[in-house]
Amino acid sequence: MKRVLFALLVATACVPALADLALATAKNCMACHAIDKKLVGPSYKDVAAKYAGQKDAADKLAVKIMKGGSGVWGPVPMPANTQVNEAEAKKLATWVLSLK
């Protein structure tokens, strides 16, 4: 019984991470980013490390996701993502920051 409960607990913990990866894929984030390697943009783990310990990091990153930016990660700018609403941007930012 303990093994079954443990397996359910682990599986339940993975569902939000998979849902957030699905959201990132649906919103085309994964065209330029990967979790653990640089593509066109930085890896999400690098983004999480850069924002680690910053006050209001999720809010700052959510704005960056929606409005884009340039000059932080090199010469290629991140375009604005008009297909991402505020709630989705906050969810994506929280997910990215959770990656270690």
Residue ranges and their predicted role:
Residues 1-18:
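Classic N-terminal secretory signal peptides
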Residues 18-35:
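Sequence/structural segment immediately N-terminal to covalent heme-attachment motifs in c-type
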Residues 22, 96-100:
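Short hydrophobic/aromatic patches at helix-to-coil boundaries
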Residues 50-60:
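Short microdomains enriched in Cys/His and/or Lys/Arg
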Residues 31, 40-51, 64-93:
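Axial heme c-ligation environment in periplasmic c-type cytochrome domains
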Residues 36, 55, 68-72, 99-100:
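A general structural signal marking secondary-structure boundaries and capping sites
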